[in-house]
Structures are given as C-alpha cells and as structure tokens.
C-alpha cells in the first residue's frame, strides 16, 4: 500500500526516507498573477489538482478581532482612499494596483494598556460560535477546508476549490494562526511596527500583558479547533524581520517572548500535535536558536533575497530544523537555465529529508504561466514525480 500524502508529509518532517517526495505547487499567488495566468491559458483549476501535487489543508479559524471592524472610508481623493480595515487599522492605499504597492499605516488601534484592555475585551475574546462559524464547521466536518479559512465566510469558488480531486487521498492538515498567532506580528497589528519596537523599552508591562493575552487566546481558540478536527501541524505567524535582520534584537525578544512560545508549544505537544512551524519573512537567522529551544521544529519561507540560504541553514542545524521553502521566486520571471540551477541547488536537502522544496513566498505577477508550468515540470522531474 502506498503511503498517504499525510504520512509522507510526517515522514518528511521526521527526516525519514520517502519514496515519493512531498511537494505542493507553493503557498500563495498575488491576485495580479492569477489574472495574468488566466489570460495566458490557466483554466482556474486548483493548482494542486492541475499539477497533481500534494496539498496542506488549512483548518484554522480566524484568530484576530471578532467582531471584525466595519470597513469605513474616512477620506479619499482621485488616487488614494483612507479607511479602517477589518483589524481596526487606519490605512491609506492607492486605488490602482493595491496589491503591488505598500499601504500607508495611518493609525493603529492600541497605544497604551487601557486601550489594549478595551481592545482585548471587545475584540479578542473567544466568541467560539463566531470564530468557528457554521460554514467553518461544515467544511471541517466534510474534510474539505483548504482555502484561506480565517476571515468571515468562505466564498463559493473557494468551497469548490477545497473539494479537490483525488477523493481517496488523505492530506495533512495545518492550523495556522495567521496574522494573530505570535508574539511580535500580532502585537504589531495593534501597535504598529515603530511603536512596538520602542515599547519593548518604554512600555515593557504593556508588551508583557499583550504577549500573555496572545498565548492565552492561542491555547483557548486552538482547544476549540481540536473539538472539531485533528491536524498534523500548527504554525505561528510572525513576519518580524527584513533583509537586514529581525526588527527587534534576539536577546530582547527572547527575554519577553520565550516563555510564551514555550508554554504554547508545550500545550500543543500535550494535545498530540507533533510538529510546530513558524512563518516569518526576512533574515531570521539570529532568531532560529530561540525558536528551536522553545519547541518550534520547522520554519517557512526562507526568503533568498533577504539572505536566507537553506543549504547553509541545514549545515548549521542539521536534523534539528525542518525547512519549508527557500527556492528563489525571482528566478521564475526569466525561467530557463537560471530556474533549473536554482531548483538543482536545493535538491541535496530533499535527499537528506526534513525539507519541502517550494518557492520562498507568493508568486509575483512578473512570472508567466508558461514559466511557472516549466518550473513545476522541472521540480517534478527532479523529485522523480514527473
């Protein structure tokens, strides 16, 4: 009997040999990329079905503000619009090319302890019936949840996409506390990045309280998820680095965050969740020891343009760290020999185990449908999955 996708996924993270390497098409597309590909020949079939690859099914509810903030336009001119988003942040955005330009963050919902306690009481309580909505429950019960589950109700086309082909296959499942499951990223959503970085020095009590609240909620919300479904892997979300390194020094971050990571990881393991991952963009090298020690065993996406090199990271950490990602998305715009060399570069890690080869984040719109198909074909060829 051939092992299921779920079993191959677990074997991979446990550095056990797998006859058929576990691989998915990637994680995300920019909206403009999807539009471009549809013009160039993609019929919209979910990519894991189209390319006959594995999938990591998401079963997470929304870990952020409930009720969500109402979308409220505060000001607009010919080129920009200023509004309150679903997380309570006042944003100013270009009307055109929203996805390809950075918004301006005008104001954040929290500035001090009193505002945080009010925000937490009004927006961050469990509200199990709203977080784990009827739509979420029925999707999970049918084993079909896959698209971005978190926010609100699933759209019809996402439900269709989540059904997928290969009806007998058992996919691995992931509960990803996206945007609100961590001890830097979620605080940044409330305070803003500059205010947060300064608060580590000026408002340590506020930081301590916010981290404690997040750890409490991560455990409380995830306990509810486990009433409805099992999953193989839990992911934190941090996005706390750029190409120059982390946005807060590793020693300072450890002082505040370590015990909260350790507590959540300990609780997860006690529930039988064997694998705990974390998503952070940027150059996270100096944070890896802290995360490993706290109980996190794999990371994503290892952005090449930020100096992350999965070959070097593997040399340093060996079997202690599972790696997901690390293929430079930038080589796909040109494709050809540069793309093949980049895929070749990471293949030794596939042999060693504990590695899932995929792009180091969302596929940008400068990648043609043909180049993406070429990339997947070559990846499958190198993995003997052609």
Put a short name on every predicted segment.
Residues 1-33, 82-84, 111-386:
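Active-site loop segments of alpha/beta catalytic cores
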Residues 2, 40, 74-76:
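Generic structural signal for well-ordered secondary structure
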Residues 17, 52-56, 75-77, 86:
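Short, solvent-exposed loop/edge-beta patches enriched in aromatic
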Residues 18, 43, 58, 62-64, ...:
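Compositionally biased, intrinsically disordered/low-complexity regions enriched for serine, proline
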Residues 26-28, 61-62, 84-86, 96:
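Acidic/polar N-terminal loop/beta-strand segments that form early-domain functional surfaces
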Residues 30-71:
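Segments that shape or occlude catalytic/ligand-binding pockets
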Residues 73-125:
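A contiguous, low-structure linker/loop signature
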């Amino acid at each position: 009997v051939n092992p299921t996708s779920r079993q191959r996924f677990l074997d991979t993270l446990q550095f056990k040999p797998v006859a058929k390497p576990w691989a998915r098409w990637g994680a995300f597309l920019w909206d403009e990329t999807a539009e471009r590909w549809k013009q160039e020949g993609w019929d919209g079939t979910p990519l894991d079905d189209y390319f006959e690859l594995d999938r990591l099914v998401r079963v997470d509810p929304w870990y952020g503000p409930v009720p969500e903030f109402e979308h409220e336009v505060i000001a607009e001119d010919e080129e920009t619009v200023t509004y309150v988003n679903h997380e309570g942040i006042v944003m100013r955005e270009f009307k055109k090319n929203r996805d390809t330009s950075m918004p301006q963050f005008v104001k954040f919902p929290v500035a001090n302890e009193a505002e945080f306690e009010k925000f937490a009481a009004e927006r961050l309580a469990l509200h199990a019936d709203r977080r784990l909505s009827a739509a979420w429950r029925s999707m999970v019960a049918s084993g079909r949840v896959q698209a971005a589950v978190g926010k609100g109700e699933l759209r019809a086309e996402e439900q269709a996409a989540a059904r997928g082909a290969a009806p007998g296959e058992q996919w691995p499942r992931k509960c990803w506390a996206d945007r609100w499951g961590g001890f830097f990223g979620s605080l940044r959503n409330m305070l803003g990045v500059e205010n947060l970085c300064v608060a580590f020095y000026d408002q340590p009590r506020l930081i301590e309280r916010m981290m404690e609240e997040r750890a409490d909620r991560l455990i409380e919300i995830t306990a509810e998820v486990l009433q409805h479904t099992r999953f193989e892997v839990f992911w934190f979300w941090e996005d706390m680095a750029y190409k120059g390194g982390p946005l807060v020094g590793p020693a300072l971050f450890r002082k505040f965050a370590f015990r909260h990571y350790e507590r959540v990881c300990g609780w997860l393991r006690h529930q039988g969740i064997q694998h705990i991952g974390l998503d952070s963009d940027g150059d996270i090298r100096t944070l890896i020891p802290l995360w490993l020690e706290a109980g996190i065993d794999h990371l994503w996406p290892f952005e090449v343009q930020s100096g992350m090199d999965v070959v070097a990271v593997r040399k340093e950490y060996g079997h202690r760290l599972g790696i997901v990602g690390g293929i430079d998305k930038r080589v796909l715009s040109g494709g050809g020999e540069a793309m093949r060399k980049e895929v070749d570069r990471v293949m030794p890690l596939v042999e060693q185990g504990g590695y899932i080869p995929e792009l180091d984040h969302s596929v940008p719109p400068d990648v043609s449908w043909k180049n993406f198909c070429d990339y997947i074909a070559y990846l499958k060829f190198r993995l003997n999955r052609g």
